[in-house]
């Protein structure tokens, strides 16, 4: 049984006694004042925008739901900052329009979850400004188009282990709390379901050391909605029922810091972008766990970029949860992190490691990826890595492909079987990743690369299961040295004589040379040396791509081939040697 929910509003994120005082407190800080000004500006722009329409993109309504969520969060926060009635009226108009949609697309339940969260916040935060007819209309939609469809049929996300679990339960709990006095039994059932099932995804997502299996971009998605759910529970009940104590969650900010390389680009494995925007989740986490060091230079600059923007139109969604950061923002003192290494832990769903030689923009960085291609948002990238030195990313990962574009062409993007179309997609399959290939074959999707030895300057991955049937043992050792050089040693045994091993990496730098490779970028140079094998081969990405692939301008796949000797064993050593390296 849950503690009783009172009939008083607001109760989402805040309580009826304290109300919106946290908004005023944040407004007294430098960063809070800047964000408040941006929110009010956007609210004024939204007064001129037409309400959302139910326009599908392929099988999704998600873009519309996200746009509505940004609009309602912005207008509701702006109303409580200014008491300007027009903001509340515009939010009510938006909510009434989407309440009249035929449905919120329950076949893709993320769409329902984000729409339900939007209306729940608006209904709760603007309750006193709505008339009885508006309240009934919005409340009915939350119940009939939001919460009840989550109990119709069997939804895999209820017990799932990825971001769908986090997002969908958060949306449903928001809706349940908003209408709790009208539907107390439905509300309690919905909230208890979330409390019971969220640990499944939290353990998979954060345990043991906070690394997110789907990469930093999806950390932003899954963690933001995990935080939404925990903040909702704390606002309504004064507790999160132990969810924030799940191992790894309290240190997950370390993962974000470690995943941001010296250039500001991410260690963008899996379906990931190049950079993170300012994060509502991070602001909550900093305050919840007293970690001002997570308000890093990158987060600080991202927030500044967001607050300086003054968009003239808001037809498409922006950083939709950022207005809620005003509940948690403080002027945290700038505290530099001094951790040069990060390890996900050997029990992590997707093992990763990150190393750096320092905290300057020119210091070296190495990100190492284990795991399985069949993992959440997985790529064929077991053993892959990214590498930076002297302010240049020399070895790249191309990150995510455009989902809608691929789906619209009829490709089976979400099928992780060995023969799936997914592995034909350049950014996702083996051709674009910095991995080993045996006889040109892809990695095995049922394989799983583990980090079997982690040290402060190096790690070893066991890649054997990715190449089962072609080798008895495959390991990769990566060492980032204090002088910024990177040494990679691949040991393969139990192979057929004369089998062809391809050693490849992805780069955006210019490349030349056959025996010793020279990479050049922005006036910087780096040599790549190997212990054996044939000449370096430099292949423009477009020669490896299909017509359905997104453009990858300037990207090269650099490789060499080596034949397996008669004894079936082979060791390959490759060194990346930046010019002007430290301690030369």
Q: What does each of the following model-derived ranges do?
A:
Residues 1-13, 20:
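N-terminal pre-domain segments of enzymes
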Residues 11-18, 25-28, 32-265, 272-273, ...:
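Aromatic-lined, polymer-binding surfaces characteristic
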Residues 172, 256, 355, 490, ...:
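A residue-level signal for conserved active-site and pocket-lining positions in enzyme catalytic cores
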Residues 179, 218-394, 453-462, 560-569:
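Carbohydrate-active enzyme catalytic cores, enriched for enzymes
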Residues 304-308, 405-584:
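CBM-like, beta-strand-rich accessory domains located in the C-terminal region of large
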């Amino acid at each position: 049984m849950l503690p009783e929910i009172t009939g008083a509003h607001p109760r989402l994120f805040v309580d009826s006694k304290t109300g919106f005082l946290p908004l005023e407190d944040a407004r007294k800080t430098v960063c809070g004042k800047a964000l408040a000004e941006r929110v009010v500006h956007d609210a004024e722009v939204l007064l001129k925008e037409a309400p959302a329409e139910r326009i599908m993109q392929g099988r999704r309504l998600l873009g519309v739901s996200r746009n509505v969520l940004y609009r309602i969060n912005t207008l509701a926060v702006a109303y409580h900052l200014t008491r300007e009635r027009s903001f509340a009226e515009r939010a009510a108009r938006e909510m009434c329009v989407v309440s009249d949609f035929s449905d919120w697309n329950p076949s893709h339940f993320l769409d329902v979850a984000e729409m339900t969260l939007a209306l729940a916040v608006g209904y709760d935060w603007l309750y006193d400004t709505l008339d009885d007819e508006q309240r009934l209309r919005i409340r009915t939609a939350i119940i009939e188009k939001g919460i009840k469809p989550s109990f119709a049929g069997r939804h895999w996300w209820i017990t799932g282990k990825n971001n769908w679990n986090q997002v969908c339960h958060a949306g449903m709990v928001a809706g349940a709390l908003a209408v709790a006095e009208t539907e107390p039994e439905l509300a309690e059932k919905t909230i208890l379901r979330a409390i019971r099932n969220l640990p499944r995804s939290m353990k998979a997502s954060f345990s043991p050391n906070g690394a997110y299996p789907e990469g930093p971009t999806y950390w932003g998605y899954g963690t933001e909605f995990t935080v939404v759910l925990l903040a909702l529970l704390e606002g309504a009940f004064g507790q999160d029922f132990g969810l924030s104590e799940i191992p790894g969650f309290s240190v997950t900010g370390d993962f974000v810091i470690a995943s941001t390389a010296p250039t500001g680009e991410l260690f963008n494995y899996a379906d990931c972008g190049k950079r993170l925007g300012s994060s509502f989740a991070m602001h909550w986490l900093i305050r919840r766990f007293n970690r001002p060091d997570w308000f890093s230079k990158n987060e600080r600059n991202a927030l500044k970029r967001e607050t300086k923007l003054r968009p003239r139109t808001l037809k498409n969604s922006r950083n939709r949860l950022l207005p809620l950061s005003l509940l948690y923002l403080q002027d945290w003192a700038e505290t530099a992190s001094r951790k040069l290494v990060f390890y996900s832990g050997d029990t992590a769903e997707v093992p990763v490691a990150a190393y750096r030689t320092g905290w300057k923009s020119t210091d070296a960085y190495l990100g190492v990826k284990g795991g399985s291609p069949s993992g959440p948002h997985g790529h064929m990238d077991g053993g892959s890595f990214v590498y930076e030195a002297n302010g240049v990313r020399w070895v790249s990962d191309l990150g995510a492909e455009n989902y809608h574009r691929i789906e619209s062409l009829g490709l089976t993007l979400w099928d992780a079987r060995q023969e799936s179309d997914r592995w034909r997609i350049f950014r996702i399959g083996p051709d674009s990743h910095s991995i080993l290939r045996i006889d040109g074959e892809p990695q095995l999707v049922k394989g799983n690369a583990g980090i079997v030895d982690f040290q402060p300057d190096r790690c070893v991955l066991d890649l054997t299961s990715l190449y089962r049937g072609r080798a008895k043992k495959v390991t990769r050792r990566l060492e980032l040295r204090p002088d910024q050089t990177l040494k990679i040693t691949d040991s393969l045994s139990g192979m057929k004589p004369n089998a062809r091993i391809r050693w490849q990496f992805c780069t955006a730098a210019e490349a030349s040379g056959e025996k010793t490779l020279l990479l050049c970028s922005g006036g910087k140079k780096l040599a790549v040396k190997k212990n054996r094998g044939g000449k370096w081969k430099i292949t423009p990405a477009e020669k490896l791509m299909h017509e359905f692939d997104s453009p990858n301008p300037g990207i090269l796949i650099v490789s060499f081939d080596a034949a397996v000797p008669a004894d079936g064993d082979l060791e390959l050593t490759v060194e990346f040697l930046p010019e002007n390296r430290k301690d030369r």
